[in-house]
Amino acid sequence: MGDKMPDSSQLVIGADLAGQPIAQAMRLANRHGLVAGATGTGKTVTLQRLAEAFSDAGVAVFAADIKGDLCGLGAAGNPQGKVAERIAGMPWLNYKPQAYPVTLWDIHGESGHPLRTTLSEMGPLLIGALLELTDSQQSALYAAFKVADREGLLLLDLKDLKALLNHLRDNPQLLGEDAALMTTGSSQALLRRLATLEQQGAEALFGEPALQLEDILQPAADGRGRIHLLDASRLVHEAPKVYATFLLWLLAELFEQLPERGDADKPLLALFFDEAHLLFADTPKALQERLEQVVRLIRSKGVGVYFVTQSPGDLPDDVLAQLGLRVQHGLRAFTAKEQKSLRAVADGFRPNPAFDALSVLTELGIGEALVGTLADKGTPEMVQRVLVAPPQSRIGPLTDTERTMLIAGSPFKGRYDKPVDRESAYEVLMGRKGLAPEAEPGKPAAEEPSFTDKAGEFLGTAAGQALKSAMRQAANQLGRQLVRGLMGSLLGGSKRR
């Protein structure tokens, strides 16, 4: 960038060895990116720095908070010691300690707003990956979804799917030509997998009010992009498949719902996928191929995807080849295999005659990185050794009190916090049997609203969100079948409206 002062049109990463800013044009931020490095080298702080830059430019951010300290974005920084020294060496940074507009989410609803989707919205391909089904079990699941679509049975939560499977076991004639797919063994296996999923606490992910993507894209009152943080500190250890599947669903929904934007001065949304290797671990080939397609195509929808992991080798080559911005923190290499991997990382950068990237990789200190940006024409710049700019927010977690206050002051307070259990497959099928559905603990049935309620107020409530979801479900069924699976638009299905 030379002596030019960086602004919000630039995604500033830090300074080179001469103290000059290293940045990439914000309009190229939809070309995706990578933040990699060994544990303890500074990846989280780099992620924090990038999230701030996006927010300042008015770009929404969704990121997973794996260690629990990324939430420091919600409090102003207090730089001291080496951090203060680094800031002093970057006078062009215009550093100003400040908190950022953060919304906290938690699938379990403990450390943030509950985060939910429905089985119908997730689709059988992703659910099959979540349950780690065999091919025959996956076929049985598709057959069940097909019946649900034909019978008009909404699949919102796990009890809906269990009720449907039990119903098909007792009434196999409903499967028609697909009856051979739903054997006793496959049905029992599906029910066992669902029980295991419940034991992992995954049932909290499915239900209503479901997450509305327009809420993710909604800017803060001051025009900055809102930063949405998913507290995954518990989830990623207890149920890594649930964590990965939710992120895949989010990516698929964005691809399906967002219109084409073409070239723009900045993205709509930046997604940060921490522990990115989990997205590809034991992933069925069909799902991985679709994921690679979506990563390639979603940039035209204004979404930049940033993978955060220890080594670039954690990602498939087809995905790695699509990543424009690369921030590589230090790596350690002791074995011959690690040395080979290290060389591959160095070879992934455009060489800089000023230094040997391979040698530098093992010398980088905390908060240092090799950075490869894109030039204005979209071609790779020479790799630079960079001191990452400190974030303006707090480096470290919020206190419990601060977290509670942040949730209480959230613009989404009351919209997602209380679950709504409206009539769906479980209630319909229990009704056909003449049985009264059992109320789930903590899941009250939705009350019918008064006609005197204002429409705007109603649609902001949990019940209103459920109504919007119901309308969306009905539109989906008119436009496409539930068996579309993941990214149905890639397979010729209709997009959501």
Predicted segments, located by residue:
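P-loop NTPase motor domains
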Residues: 51-61, 68-293, 363-364, 425
